[in-house]
Amino acid sequence: MEDFVIKEATFAKFMEDTVELFLAERRKEFRLTREADKELYCVYYGADKPKGTVIISHGFTETAEKYLEPIYYFVKHGYNVYQPEHCGHGRSYRLVEDLSLVYIDRYERYVTDLLAAAEAAKQAHPQIPLFLFGHSMGGGIAAAALSLRPELFAGAVLSSPMICPLTGDIPWSVAKPLAKLLCLLGKAKQYVPGGHAYDGKERFEDSASTSRERFAYYQKKRSTQPLFQMNAASCGWLNETARLNRYLMSKGWQRIETPLLIFQAQDDTFVSVAAQDRFAEKVKAAGKTSVKKLRVDNTKHEIFNSEDQVLQNYWKEILLFLQE
């Protein structure tokens, strides 16, 4: 497979001069409404001769704009792309006024919204297969969606999926009941301990990326758009990730019938790789589908924001999986 990954040295220029123009010609924005006054922002990019459709489920505090490079690769290789922005993110509806705070009342809302977007994509393109790509939080949401509608998807790529989050210096065994207690005390819509509003001070060295140019490209966009400045979790969000984890590990894995390609970062400080291992083994043991798991060297949590050679191998695996 040819070397098609955008080079780090000229990344920003190529994105601005080539990728953004290419995608703008193929871009359509629309909104889905499942509930009154709750609009889910979605964006669609059409391939010239589509052989499949990919729906992207983004991660915590992210937006569709963070995925322009992955979208470009999908579209250039013949896949339409649909990308909704999850509740509380970007241009989609929110349940709190603070633009920095990520809050969700029930994790099922994420899953139902994603499935609504997936159904819209399938209805628009019924003759070609639908695939799911989920990163981090979006990977956990994607896994739950797969368990509920296995017939909808031909395959799924889970990149550093959040089966269970990591909670820094506080062990998960402590953070989980603490989040539940804080919610019971009426603090569901408050920042988790240590969380704060967006201040624009995130450093590359502390980020989930190993590509400085890719990190800087999105941070520039984020710094000028308040709707892109989600920054920290609420107690309610953390409590719901615990509920999602419990569902995936107790029931969800039993219902997955879609072929899976799971990528794991070498140095992931945001989600538990051990939890990914347990989840993958459960799905594999159930015997209903294939599971391929790849640990990627020289990567942090955002594998899709890695250096050139890592990305070339990463995208080769993804495109081969979709073709199979």
Question: What annotation goes with each model-predicted range?
Answer:
Residues 1-33, 40-45:
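An N-terminal hydrophobic leader/cap segment in hydrolases
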Residues 51, 59-62:
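Active-site glycine-rich loops that stabilize anionic/oxyanionic intermediates
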Residues 64, 71-97:
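Conserved alpha/beta-hydrolase
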Residues 102-122:
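Alpha/beta-hydrolase active-site loop
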Residues 142-227:
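Alpha/beta-hydrolase-fold enzymes
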Residues 256, 262-264, 268:
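Short beta-strand/loop motif that positions the catalytic acidic residue
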Residues 258, 272-282:
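Short alpha-helix in the alpha/beta-hydrolase fold that links the catalytic acid
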Residues 290-324:
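Catalytic active-site module of serine/aspartate enzymes centered on a nucleophile-bearing elbow/loop
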